[in-house]
Amino acid sequence: MSRIKRGVTTRAKHKRILDQAKGYRGRRKNTIRVARQAVEKAGQYAYRDRKVKKRSFRALWIQRINAAVRAEGLTYSQFIHGAKLAGIELDRKAMADLAMNEGAIFNAVIAQAKAALPAA
């Protein structure tokens, strides 16, 4: 029975790690030990930031809606409350898009939300 060494699998594993580390600076791109740590950390950042991306976009949409709504004399929270009372079922992404690109249509949505608010 012949002896089996693991040179081929080790080389393949190392190659896979170094391919993932392509474009990194310094020893991170060509030293397997450092590259492995860098690739693992990059994966952790990627996982975390896929979650953060969702929060960031929601915050951006809220800022855009708030800016458009304040020009019409409402606050963001008043507008959202009025929209809920009026039965407007647009999500924040769609409302932000309307506010940016279709100002007249968004102003009509604001008017509906204003009308649904109780007079204070």
Curated annotation (Swiss-Prot):
Q: Name one GO molecular function term.
A: structural constituent of ribosome
Would you kindly state one Gene Ontology biological process term found in this protein's UniProt entry?
A: translation
Keywords of this entry: Ribonucleoprotein, Ribosomal protein, RNA-binding, rRNA-binding
Superkingdom in the source lineage: Bacteria
**PROSITE patterns, per the entry:** RIBOSOMAL_L20 (PS00937)
Similarity remark: Belongs to the bacterial ribosomal protein bL20 family.
**HAMAP family the UniProt entry points to:** Ribosomal_bL20
**Function of the molecule:** Binds directly to 23S ribosomal RNA and is necessary for the in vitro assembly process of the 50S ribosomal subunit. It is not involved in the protein synthesizing functions of that subunit.
- The protein depicted here goes by the name Large ribosomal subunit protein bL20
